[in-house]
C-alpha cells in the first residue's frame, strides 16, 4: 500500500504601519515517503537580510511546532531535534527568499508549513 504525504503552505500577510509586510510561501505538494521537497518563502516590506527567519509546521489536528530558524547572514541555523539532519534551512538575501529542504520524508512530516519573521 502506497502512502502519500500532503504538504500545504499558508499565505501569511501582516499589515505594517508604514508598509505591508508579506511572506508568501510556495512549493507545497503531495509526495511519497522517502521523497524530498523544497519549500520557498518570498518576503517583502522589511529588511530581509537583517532579520532572523523561521519555519514552523502544524500537523493535522495538532498544535504548531517550531522547525528551525536562520539568522540574517546564514551564519547561525538552528533546528528542532526531531528534524535535525533531514531538514535544511537556507536563504537568498539577494532575492528575499527563505527555503526549507526536506529529505527522506516521513508520514509525520505531513503538515501545513509556515515561514515567519
Curated annotation (Swiss-Prot):
Residues 69-85 are annotated as: Complementarity-determining-2. Gene3D superfamilies: Immunoglobulins (2.60.40.10). GO terms for cellular component: extracellular region; immunoglobulin complex. Pfam families: V-set. GO terms for biological process: adaptive immune response. PANTHER family: IMMUNOGLOBULIN HEAVY CHAIN. This is Ig heavy chain V region G4. It comes from Caiman crocodilus.
Amino acid at each position: 500500500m502506497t502512502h502519500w504525504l500532503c504538504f500545504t503552505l499558508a499565505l501569511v500577510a501582516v499589515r505594517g504601519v508604514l508598509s505591508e509586510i508579506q511572506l508568501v510561501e510556495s512549493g507545497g505538494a503531495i509526495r511519497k515517503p522517502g521523497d524530498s521537497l523544497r519549500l520557498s518563502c518570498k518576503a517583502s516590506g522589511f529588511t530581509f537580510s537583517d532579520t532572523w527567519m523561521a519555519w514552523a509546521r502544524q500537523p493535522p489536528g495538532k498544535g504548531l511546532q517550531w522547525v528551525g530558524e536562520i539568522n540574517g547572514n546564514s551564519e547561525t541555523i538552528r533546528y528542532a531535534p526531531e528534524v535535525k539532519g533531514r531538514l535544511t534551512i537556507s536563504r537568498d538575501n539577494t532575492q528575499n527568499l527563505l527555503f526549507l529542504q526536506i529529505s527522506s520524508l516521513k508520514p509525520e512530516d505531513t503538515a501545513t508549513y509556515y515561514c515567519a519573521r
